[in-house]
């Protein structure tokens, strides 16, 4: 894998696109990260991390409904990751859904204990 500006070369599989998306995200390039995560889910639609990471990128851009949608998909795939609920709770807060935010925060705490 060759690197230019700390970004991986063109990926060939879903995990490669997630890795590239993560590199974009670390650099604050959320639109490019979203594009990479989207390619990952197009190749393999059962990767909870791809939906989670794309949801986080949407969250960072203030696209809270899109974030909630992707974070919900991540939870559908893997309902046992407390981080998914914690991040969706934050998105619900900014989407002015305090009851849903509290429910997710409660679930997050349950999973951590």
Question: What do the predicted segments below correspond to?
Answer:
Residues 1-113:
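Alpha-helical tetratricopeptide repeat
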């Amino acid at each position: 894998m060759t690197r230019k500006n700390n970004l991986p070369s063109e990926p060939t599989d879903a995990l490669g696109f997630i890795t590239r998306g993560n590199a974009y995200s670390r650099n604050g390039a959320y639109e490019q990260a979203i594009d990479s995560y989207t390619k990952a889910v197009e190749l393999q639609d059962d990767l909870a991390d791809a939906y989670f990471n794309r949801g986080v990128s949407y969250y960072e851009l203030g696209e809270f409904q899109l974030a909630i949608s992707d974070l919900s998909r991540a939870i559908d795939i893997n309902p046992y990751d407390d981080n998914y609920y914690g991040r969706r709770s934050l998105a619900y807060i900014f989407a002015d859904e305090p009851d849903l935010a509290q429910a997710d925060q409660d679930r997050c705490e349950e999973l951590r204990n």
